[in-house]
Amino acid sequence: MMTKNIRSAALLVFCLALAQQTMGHGSMTPEGDICILEIGYLKAHFKTYLPGSYGHEQFCETLPEASEAVFVMEYEHDSLAEMMIEFRIIRELTGKREFTREKDIKKIDDLESITVAYHPPQREPDVFSITHQFEDPGWYVGIITARTLALDETYVAVFPFEVGFTGYRYWPFVAFAIALLGSALYYDSRRERSA
């Protein structure tokens, strides 16, 4: 019975570690091999490229290194092509990292002082893109604001992302799960030999 509990615990820790990697951050949701950005009720395919080091490889919420990044948003809804789109990247200073939401951004008094990239509002038919040179690794927050011209409505997407992400913070969970599973198997084999 104890062995079954140990195995279950090891499996749970392992699954939680994997699930944490696949969770969407903020308005961004990984869906298969693409990322879907939700701007209010509107959706867009969102991808980031690091052309200098990774060529045409696409990234969603984590960029493996600080370098030139090209952010590309392809509209799923035609109405986005008619809206004024503003794009801002800020340093994540709330301490919430991947859990930063729009309400956290609204509490920041001086957004300009932590802005690292800004694309002023303008209409971009079909595809929106912005290029930014990241100098430092760390957590950042993308803020996309879409405004209708006729109805004066505003929709916002907030998505935290990490630059210089290597996946190292999940290894302790994986190592612990493997050690726990190994211990359970060792204990099981010793018990069977003595029986």
Tell me the role of every PLM-derived stretch.
Residues A19-Q21:
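N-terminal signal peptide c-region/cleavage motif recognized by signal peptidases
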Residues M1-A10:
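Bacterial N-terminal signal peptides that target proteins for export
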Residues H25-S129, E135-P137, T145-A195:
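Contiguous segments within soluble domain cores/interaction surfaces
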Residues L11-C15:
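Hydrophobic helical h-region of N-terminal Sec-dependent signal peptides
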